[in-house]
A protein has these predicted regions:
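Residues at secondary-structure transition points
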Residues: 8-10, 20-22, 130, 233
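Extracellular glycan-recognition regions
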Residues: 33-252
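Sec/Tat signal peptide C-region and signal peptidase I cleavage site
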Residues: 29-31
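Bacterial N-terminal signal peptides
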Residues: 14-26
């Protein structure tokens, strides 16, 4: 005859199940890695490339104000438009190796004083950035397009690019509307964005929306692409960034 467990044994078994349940709650899901948060209230931890950055307050929230550097601006003056397009303005987040995962931030952009007529306040996030600081994927916004009277401009409010081979101009010419989308935007106003990357699929979410603003099913760096994360802006933009979170994942 099998003996019945004592009260002490039953309590021990119950405690064991409690421990297992607690561990299940606190251990991250398969493939998850530690999320890294950057307040972006200083330039600490950033590598500046053709930009200047300084702490600033916008709409009562602290962040970084980022613009093209004076030196880079002077160099652009002697270049052709094609050459200018190859000059990138980036603030690299040091120590990040990103393949798949989620990137979130609050960003704002407005055309800089004296910017060309075509300036839109371009501002965004680059990912899988290579050491040459020229090869990367990115999602960015055109804030002045968000409420433009021209519907075509509205349709170009959000953009995916992959430099150097797939700039916005080539993507728009060869596959109109596939890598651009409408989203309501206001210049120089904090805008929450989330970029979710899985292999060669990426989605851009704006304003905490449950559904993506822009879906890309053929990320140009491919399923195995990897590299750094950087704050991204166009040379004619006054950009602000704050509250950046990078959460890499091994899941595909």
């Amino acid at each position: 005859m099998r003996s019945r467990p004592t009260d002490h044994a039953r309590r021990a078994i119950g405690f064991g199940w409690l421990v297992l349940a607690t561990v299940a709650l606190i251990v991250p899901g398969a493939g998850a890695r530690q999320a890294r948060h950057y307040a972006l209230e200083s330039v600490e931890g950033l590598r500046l490339h053709n930009v200047t950055a300084q702490p600033a307050t916008l709409q009562g929230k602290k962040g970084l104000r980022v613009t093209i550097s004076d030196e880079a601006f002077r160099r652009l003056q002697g270049m052709t438009p094609a050459e200018q397009a190859q000059v990138q303005q980036l603030a690299l987040i040091e120590g990040v190796d990103f393949t798949n995962g989620v990137i979130q931030a609050e960003i704002a952009g407005v055309p800089a004083p004296g910017a060309p007529e075509g300036a839109r306040g371009f501002v965004g996030i680059a990912f899988r950035l290579q050491s040459d600081l020229k090869t990367y994927d990115a999602f960015y916004l055109r804030p002045t397009n968000g409420r433009a009277d021209d519907q075509e401009r509205r349709n170009h409010a959000a953009q995916y690019i992959s430099h150097p081979d797939w700039p916005w101009s080539r993507l728009r010419q060869e596959t109109p509307s596939r890598y651009e989308a409408y989203v309501d935007l206001v210049p120089d106003v904090w805008t929450k964005i989330k970029i979710d990357v899985r292999a060669d699929h990426a989605r851009l979410y704006v304003h905490d929306q449950e559904q993506p603003t822009l879906v890309v099913n053929d990320v140009k760096t491919g399923a195995q692409g990897r590299g750094a994360v950087a704050l991204w802006l166009d040379r004619g933009t006054v950009a602000h960034f704050r509250n950046l979170t990078v959460e890499p994942s091994t899941a595909k």
